[in-house]
Amino acid sequence: MRRVRPLVALLAGLVSTFLLVGAAPAPAAGAPAQPVQVAPAAVTPQVEPEVEPVAATPLRVASFNVRCANCSRNDRTNKREKNWEVRRTKVISQIKAEKVDVIGVQEASPGILKGTKTSQFEDLAKRLGEPYQLTNTYRYGCARSTSYKSCTKVDNGASADVRIIYNTERLELLDQGSKQLDKEKATSGPRFLAWAIFQDRTDGRKFFFANAHTEPGQSKAKRALRKRQANLIVSTIKANNPDNLPVVLVGDFSSTKLTSANTVYDVLMKSGLVIDPLGNTKKQKSTKKATAEKLTNVKYFTLNNFKSKPTSYKGYALGAHIDYILVSKSIRVLEYKVVLSVKNGKFSGVIPSDHNMVRATILLP
């Protein structure tokens, strides 16, 4: 006969243990039923996917001294210099051909063009057409901004013949302003810094753009004035750029590495605010210090004075530049170009100005 008592006893013990540990005790007679305790299900934490930063899109910036209209009419350099009404077509075609996103122009006068009611800078912007637009449309910093006569000064951001024009499809203007760079009246008219803060519509990046034209001349007094103007450029940019956005500074600084003193350049380099992507320091001959990744026509002097052919210097791979594009160290410069139309070593067609436009393609950080 088979023995089953030990097995029965074992099963009884297991049932008893289950009732004690895994099951709630039965309520007393007449007592309300107790809720059954259910262990919560394990929750898998949600991990947010890493968002890749949007890659920067190449941006084209430029500087162009377009030669004042009245200068061509009243103080012509030579027979190759044409009136503004002839030159402007070439100025506009070069800006468009270079697909510039933002440009600082100098000598785009607020004075009225002969036989019109339009100033030179207004004429340039109008003929460039959409999507180009001025950052500031006031002619003068006066209560009646259309005329300098009987001027009651106001700060409306006007900047005389120093102007910024930008591509509205690519850039959004966030802020703008100006600063006069000479308390005393300069012999050739007041000098200004114009500035603007932009946001790139393609990737959301912001940057600070500034354009200046400092006092020309190589006398001791002129050099001293330019030094004061350079220091004012630095302090104005810092005061209006509290977020320390990357800076692009362009302009005609009225001296070169070959002049007795390259005052503005030296002050700007010492400030640490910007660097020169050409590395075009005093008497520099080679391109070994350049940080720009591609160099185009940089051997040519940016001042052409309406000569028949562009000026270069024997033994100098980097020309003497009077027009500059300087950038924050964090900005990558893909190309730096001196823009000119040359055929068989000579200027081709109408020479747009006594200066050659300079253009850089950059990547913002």
Predicted regions and their residues:
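Bacterial N-terminal signal peptides that target proteins for export
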Residues: 1-11
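N-terminal, active-site-proximal structural segment of metallo-dependent hydrolase catalytic domains
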Residues: 2, 21-127, 142-145, 154, ...
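Active-site beta-strand/loop signature of hydrolases that rely on acidic residues for catalysis
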Residues: 60-66, 91-117, 165, 196, ...
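Active-site environment of divalent metal-dependent phosphoester hydrolases
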Residues: 70, 110-113, 143, 216-218, ...
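Active-site neighborhood of phospho(di)ester-bond hydrolases with catalytic His/Asp-centered motifs
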Residues: 104-106, 135-138, 248-252, 275-281
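Structured beta-strand-rich core segments of catalytic domains in phosphoester-bond hydrolases
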Residues: 108-214
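Metal-dependent phosphoester-hydrolase catalytic domains
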Residues: 238-247, 255-365
